[in-house]
Amino acid sequence: MVYENPDGIRIGLEIHVQLNKLKTKMFCGCSTDYHNAAPNTHTCPICLGLPGTLPVLNKKVVEAAIKVGLALEGEIAEETQFHRKNYFYPDLPKGFQVTQYDYPIVSKGKVVIEGEDGEHVVGITRAHMEEDPGKLVHIGSIGKSKGVLIDYNRSGMPLIETVTEPDMRSPKEARRFLDKFRNILEYLDVFDGNLEGAMRVDANVSVHWGTRVEVKNISSHKGVERALLYEIMRQKNVIRRGGTIVQETRHFDEGRGVTLSMRTKEEAEDYRYFREPDLMPMRITDWIPAIKETLPELPDAKRTRFIEQYGITDMHARALTSKIMLADFYEGVCAKGVDPKIAATWTADVFLGELNYRDLAISSYGGKTIGFIHAKDPEVENSFKGSDMVELVTLFAEGKISDRAAVEVIRTILDGTEEKTPSQIIEEKGLFKAEDDLVTKAVAETIAENAAAVQDYLGGTEKSLNFLVGQVMKKTKGTADAKTARELILKELKG
């Protein structure tokens, strides 16, 4: 199938990612673990840009950038260097940002996503290293702020800025790209996406192959999709009314779901880049072979292996490999000898589904227990033991519990109200599968009490059978096997 793009939509992204798994900042020894710290307590003369200070490059930043480039199948530069990006803004104490200009460390990469018409390649123009500026805290909304506070704890944090080609053709594709890109970074162990401000996105979008508009500094994948949906609609309306799209920078108001004009778009020359005289150019060709040896199994390779090794579906493999810690958790469960297909169903469909419903984000996996935090309140923590999943899968495979019972146990554990094993929860809640004679009795009672539904089914109304099965499940408090109940009902009705 050829994907139609009648509106000529082109979307490119600029993604700023903090290398927050590194211990220290880009050019000084200040800790990167500042998120719960008081303002301006993780600073020093270097990251505050005080006169007379000199930067000392953190080698691990360069190594992490090379890792990212290799994972993106990009070309790693033989020689790379830093530049000064000159502009005045309160969050930039030096009056310039140390970044890379015409010698980026990575160029010409790619990421394969699920597009609107199957697999779709998004080109990577470049990826380069730079330092993060400080953080402005607006008193009130950004458009009506009565004042601004500055926190320099973030100043000097190591960043990778990745620029894509304008290869995405819908907001949904842009979100899928961001999901895949984040997944790759988490597999590389250079990035923790659960931290506030860890990934910020500038989205460039045009319609009818026309003038592009940049929507600046969007902080979530969902926000990027919403901002693009609005901006595409806005541009179409301007053109429909005979107007002209102006090349400009806009801000996305998350609360209102609209983009607002900030300024006309600067050209690169406005920043007057020049080489950073305090940092020497680097030849990094010799670093690459050793770093390549440290690359982990990446998401696409792991997905393919899961399908081949465990015999699971592509859908389950995609879900399980969408988070490195979830993939490790699943493999830990399978290592205990349980049925990998049943384990995939319960982990990918039920467990992950319950996490998403509760707005919980996976935050850790220590080999035995997977931890998670509430996406909107990181102070809310809980965990789920691999041994509990092994026990559940085993009980289900042995026919001792129904699927409803297994779901109830998972929900009870995630609610965090009881420190008990699955067997203890099942025993206390009476969730062990009902004996055959109990199910047979429940089927007979259901048929006798629901004559209208029986007649409807015999008359050709298939959904009435589902109603009857539901009544049996209700009588047995969910302990009957739904498939068995269905078979017994059909046996009775068809004589």
UniProtKB/Swiss-Prot annotation:
Any single Pfam family the record assigns to this protein: GatB_N
Keyword hit for Transferase: no
Highest taxon of the lineage: Archaea
EC top class named in words: ligase
EC number: 6.3.5.-
Gene Ontology BP terms: glutaminyl-tRNAGln biosynthesis via transamidation; translation
Recorded coiled-coil stretches: none
Catalytic reactions of this protein: L-glutamyl-tRNA(Gln) + L-glutamine + ATP + H2O = L-glutaminyl-tRNA(Gln) + L-glutamate + ADP + phosphate + H(+); L-aspartyl-tRNA(Asn) + L-glutamine + ATP + H2O = L-asparaginyl-tRNA(Asn) + L-glutamate + ADP + phosphate + 2 H(+)
UniProt keyword list: ATP-binding, Ligase, Nucleotide-binding, Protein biosynthesis
GO molecular function terms noted in the UniProt entry: asparaginyl-tRNA synthase (glutamine-hydrolyzing) activity; ATP binding; glutaminyl-tRNA synthase (glutamine-hydrolyzing) activity
NCBIfam families reported in the protein's UniProt record: gatB, PRK05477.1-2, PRK05477.1-4
Subunit structure: Heterotrimer of A, B and C subunits.
HAMAP family: GatB
Family of this protein: Belongs to the GatB/GatE family. GatB subfamily.
PANTHER family: GLUTAMYL-TRNA GLN AMIDOTRANSFERASE SUBUNIT B MITOCHONDRIAL AND PROKARYOTIC PET112-RELATED, GLUTAMYL-TRNA(GLN) AMIDOTRANSFERASE SUBUNIT B, MITOCHONDRIAL
Main function: Allows the formation of correctly charged Asn-tRNA(Asn) or Gln-tRNA(Gln) through the transamidation of misacylated Asp-tRNA(Asn) or Glu-tRNA(Gln) in organisms which lack either or both of asparaginyl-tRNA or glutaminyl-tRNA synthetases. The reaction takes place in the presence of glutamine and ATP through an activated phospho-Asp-tRNA(Asn) or phospho-Glu-tRNA(Gln).
Name this polypeptide is given: Aspartyl/glutamyl-tRNA(Asn/Gln) amidotransferase subunit B
Native species: Methanosarcina acetivorans (strain ATCC 35395 / DSM 2834 / JCM 12185 / C2A)
Classification of source organism: Archaea, Methanobacteriati, Methanobacteriota, Stenosarchaea group, Methanomicrobia
